Regions:
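Short beta-alpha junctions and helix-cap segments that line functional grooves
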Residues: 27-28, 100, 194
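Short, hinge-like loop/turn segments at secondary-structure boundaries
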Residues: 31-33, 100, 129-132
Length: 220
């Protein structure tokens, strides 16, 4: 990563999905020393309950996961932490689901990808007892999607009243207006009106003031 950071002309580096255990205090410090690194970290969680994680054969605990997130937050001022969560894994009780929800609330993510467990023939999970009914999975998924929406809006609010550096990527028409839309370094979408800004273009870095929400997912 440090070698990639030294490539001339490269303005942004964004990491893909990471194992939580990779993010140690020392690793977070080294990453924070790279100005071109986008502070967007996708740390796959799967469940916020240690008992469920054990059945999933995940090699970390919620405590270790939380330490990784805290390491990032100590080194970056406003890191975007995103994750994946599976609901309805075999044996997931109401109590275990409650633990997951509480843990997600404790961490506070920018975005969460919520999946309902689906059986796959030949897997160890497919042979497990206490398969969760589809209706229960759907309800649990809905509960976490609501939480995800509220946390995501709260994360985006950080930018309102501030200036943001945005990498413009595409033109879109929203409510009859043309906009250039791109991402901040922590992967928040921001739009800039195309009219009156003829100098704007694809792959251009601009610094713009952010006043509020254009849509639920895009700031302006």
């Amino acid at each position: 990563m440090e070698q990639v950071h030294g490539i001339p002309g490269l303005e942004r580096i964004r990491l893909g999905s990471l194992e939580p255990r990779i993010i140690t205090p020392a690793a977070a410090e080294r990453l924070a020393a790279l100005p071109k690194l986008c502070p967007h970290f996708h740390l796959s969680l799967q469940s916020g309950c240690d008992a469920t994680l054990k059945r999933m054969n995940r090699h970390y605990t919620t405590g270790e996961y939380f330490e990784s997130v805290e390491s990032l937050r100590k080194c970056f001022s406003h890191p975007a932490v995103t994750t994946d969560v599976i609901v309805g894994f075999p044996g997931e009780t109401e109590e275990e689901f409650g633990c997951t929800r509480e843990f997600l609330e404790k961490v506070g993510f920018y975005e969460m990808h919520i999946f309902k467990y689906s059986r796959r023939a030949g897997t160890a999970a497919d042979r497990m007892p206490d398969q969760v009914p589809d209706g229960v999975k759907a309800w649990r998924s809905g509960e976490l999607l609501e939480l995800e929406r509220s946390q995501s809006v709260e994360f985006r609010r950080h930018y309102i009243g501030r200036e943001a550096q945005v990498l413009l990527e595409e033109q879109l028409e929203i409510a009859g207006e043309r906009y250039w839309v791109g991402h901040t370094k922590d992967y928040v979408k921001v739009a800039v009106k195309a009219s009156g800004h003829g100098e704007l273009g694809e792959n251009l870095l601009v610094t713009v003031p952010v006043g509020g929400f254009l849509t639920d997912e895009i700031l302006i």
